[in-house]
UniProtKB/Swiss-Prot annotation:
Keywords: ATP-binding, Ligase, Metal-binding, Nucleotide-binding, Queuosine biosynthesis, Zinc. The gene is queC. Pathway: Purine metabolism; 7-cyano-7-deazaguanine biosynthesis. Catalyzes the ATP-dependent conversion of 7-carboxy-7-deazaguanine (CDG) to 7-cyano-7-deazaguanine (preQ(0)). InterPro entries: QueC (IPR018317), Rossmann-like_a/b/a_fold (IPR014729). This is 7-cyano-7-deazaguanine synthase. It is an enzyme of class 6 (ligase). GO terms for biological process: queuosine biosynthetic process. The lineage of its organism: Bacteria, Pseudomonadati, Pseudomonadota, Betaproteobacteria, Burkholderiales. It comes from the Bacteria. Its EC number is 6.3.4.20. Binds 1 zinc ion per subunit. Its cofactor is Zn(2+).
């Protein structure tokens, strides 16, 4: 396994959602330079992209120790992905399970493209670590969120670019309650509140009502998962701490 240290710079895939915002904080706690990367692929919940700047600004102003580490932000137009996708993430259709057993919110190739583009940007920027919020503990079954997929992709990227990049997925084995707990461990109640209020998870892009767990419709799979995780976190239902 390729080893990294705090002197290495990191590029975090940052959508504006809970998981990726937690990953930004995780990286800021570890690396001297942290840049962020977002993608506009015509997602139905495009409001998440509008949250990105607010989250970055809040991290700088509320956490002085991290302010000097948070570097440039990059936004990539990946509308071609939306153009070739017929999913509930890119079309206004009912969210349901497809014939292949996967939810129709699955966008084929999304994380593969995201990480490949991220690796190319990291190569140019001299950053050795890529950080993503992929998770297969209480996820929706997306095959491109699996640990095996990320490990295989790391090998392919290093071979294809003759480089030594590391793909870090700090949430891979955490459930949503532990993800909230990790935020608390990283930045206390202030970071939990920042993530609760400033990030966006809802698949349908609803941001009119602030619930205890954050903004959202409360009915889509993403909202239900976030709500359930937040409630479990408040009850302290996880016995062990989230690993840092």
């Amino acid at each position: 396994m390729i080893r990294t240290d705090a002197k290495d710079g990191a590029l975090v895939l940052f959508s504006g959602g809970q998981d990726s915002a937690t990953c930004v904080a995780w990286a800021l706690e570890r690396y001297q330079t942290v840049e962020t990367l977002g993608f506009d692929y015509g997602q139905r919940h495009r409001v998440e992209l509008e949250c990105r700047e607010g989250v970055r600004d809040a991290l700088k102003h509320r956490f002085p120790a991290w302010a000097g580490r948070l570097g440039d932000d990059h936004m990539i137009d990946l509308s071609v992905l939306g153009a070739i996708s017929d999913t509930a993430m890119t079309r206004t259709i009912e969210i349901e399970t497809a014939a292949n057993g996967l939810p129709n919110t699955f966008v084929p190739g999304r994380n593969l493209l995201f990480m490949t583009i991220a690796a190319a940007i990291a190569y140019r920027r001299g950053l050795r670590v890529l950080v993503g919020g992929m998770c297969e503990t209480d996820f929706s079954g997306y095959p491109d969120c699996r640990d095996d997929t990320m490990k295989a992709l790391q090998v392919a990227l290093n071979l294809g670019m003759d480089t030594r990049v590391v793909l870090e997925t700090p949430l891979m084995w955490l459930d949503k309650a532990q993800t909230w707990q990790l935020a608390e461990q990283l930045g206390g109640a202030a970071l939990v509140e920042l993530i609760r209020v400033e990030t966006h998870t809802c698949y349908v892009g609803e941001r009119a009502e602030l619930h205890d767990w954050g903004f959202g419709c409360g009915e889509c799979p993403a909202c239900k998962l976030r709500k359930r995780g937040y409630e479990a976190y408040l009850k302290g239902e996880r016995v062990t701490e989230a690993p840092l």
